[in-house]
């Protein structure tokens, strides 16, 4: 958890970073601009994943930026400043969804891959020097094909898995923010959690959470299968999707997502908890907490406060014809925290065009940094990047940019956020994409990294 500094200029772009707080891609050293994930380092450097230019199958790489935003060309050992993520599958389309720093100084990179007819998730583990750790998986790489999730021998699933937990992706319109959908998280003892969805023989979609050992092998001590299916007991739901995951210090795992009711006229979001053995934890308010009647809702992120184990969940929902950022706080036991918005979910519409929360970071004083994309969730001229600081009770912090939030808005393009994190000194780092109108549909014209003062 980050200790905030709350300076007088909090929420304004940091002029010491790149060009007055904004680094635009491509840059002379890097042809690509599709930024994907970001991680800050203790020495104030930044790891950034992006896809290079060149079309289908172009390399996916990790770059390391110095504190001032310049490329660290010593990274990777070949003078390029880049490390290519190789999964042993030529011409596969890859992305990077998460970068983790391991307790031994090494690194774990998680993403998705696709090469017809196969697709799935991958994990690549590196030593501290960014050489492959060949003790992990097969020579440093573990592939988890979607078709293998939920082995049909055990749970009667047909093995068919969806490639995205975002049902809106089928509309054909470009999403304004990159839905990470399947997520991964590493536990303190090295266990790795993956979430996604599977389809039953009856056609019902259900979320799934899998646990791997630190060497990449399946952990069969988790629910005796290596995975657990999200059932949402007591809810007559049609489908449920996983969108977020978080692990407590005691090894219990929280999974969040959305569901549609059986009558097709409603739904909402859920947070459910499994114990360290993969069983539904009924001490968590019966096992599952829901926010119902949140039409068109998503639960994009879950964070846990170290101090008291309380849980912050954020996403979005439709309210009065516009998308609203949605956030709620639960106690460690799964009850709504009365200290936040009087124990009710907080729906925020800070700009007229609506908004979504995609990421949040918890501060030591109880404040919450939240960031997302404005608009209706798709790449239109309404898409900008909004970042806010909320006080522990859910109200906006007026010391952050003078009104509690700030909007990143380039003149010629419209913007979407991909990822957000925070440096140890509280400065906020975000990466995302620039979009432009084309003859057929909005297209990606560039990428960016920005840094805000704390």
List the predicted regions and their residue ranges:
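Extracytoplasmic mature domains of secreted or surface-exposed proteins
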Residues: 1-454
